[in-house]
Amino acid sequence: LTCLICPEKYCNKVHTCLNGENICFKRFNRILGKRYDLGCAATCPTVKTGIVQCCSTDKCNH
């Protein structure tokens, strides 16, 4: 699985996930402004504030 890993909304940097990391995620936090966290995870992350989107195909966290 390959996921995007940039902190910007429009990202072209990809990362090959490690064994056991089967999820790509995108986390957006409105409190901090336009901040995006993208990457790989074993499970979909949970957050107290903001929005998280998870998916399981290559580069799906755009």
Swiss-Prot record:
Disulfide bridges in this chain: 3-24, 6-11, 17-40, 44-54, 55-60
GO cellular component annotations of the record: extracellular region
GO MF annotation, one: toxin activity
UniProt xrefs under Gene3D superfamilies: CD59
CDD domains, sorted: TFP_snake_toxin
Protein location: Secreted
Family classification: Belongs to the three-finger toxin family. Ancestral subfamily. Orphan group II sub-subfamily.
Protein name: Weak neurotoxin 5
